[in-house]
Amino acid sequence: MLLSLKSRFVGNVYVIECVGRIVLGDEVKALEAELQVAEREFSRIVLNLSEVSRLDSIAMGLLVRYAERLGKRGGGLRLAGPPPFVTTLLNMTKLSTMLPGYPTEEDAILSFLKQDSGGEAKERSGPRVLVFDESADLCVFVRTVLTGRGYDVRSTCSFRDAKILLGVDGTDYILVGPSTPRLSAETVVQSLTALSPKANVLQMAPDFKIRDAREATDALLQMFGSGQDSQA
């Protein structure tokens, strides 16, 4: 297959990085499968096309179809770093409004996050929490537990993305998981706290991710009930 895909989430934005060709066959099928996974939980998707060398009419039709579906849910599909040939195609077909392009991935992500920060801030139902850990599954688990208790949770597996989230909107809690790639937990805490100095800082214990789900849930809830600078 001539296409490789890499995905992650930044808060409530799902990011798909594409490298290669998006054309009829296995490539389009692979991208559609990734979009199907994304839309199960996310309505806002960023597609990074900066390293895409070809995109045929079938692929464009796929993007339009998902842009329409996501738009009906209040979200959308936005393109990051589209090559000149894609930009030209969007302008020729008058699709640039439905599939807006941004110079960089960060710009596309921020376009969604700033939209949240402005128009939807009044809809928050509880304290804000930023969760950072390299495990997407752990982030989903923590987000599910805390959201069910009334917290407004954003999570990410990327340190860079965590800083983007804090740069757009502050938080009441910073929750750092046991797995922080390339950086020590202490460095992560110091860097993120500098961006949101009033936030309560919480750290999961090193064995948190291997605990029984019930035990982990109890520890998580106890940690949030015990105040600042706690560890579960």
Show where each model-derived region lies:
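Amphipathic alpha-helical interaction surfaces in cytosolic regulatory modules
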Residues: 25-99, 186-194
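Acidic catalytic/metal-coordinating carboxylates
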Residues: 158, 184-187
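Short hydrophobic/Thr-rich beta-strand motif most characteristic of the beta2 strand and flanking loop
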Residues: 150-157, 165
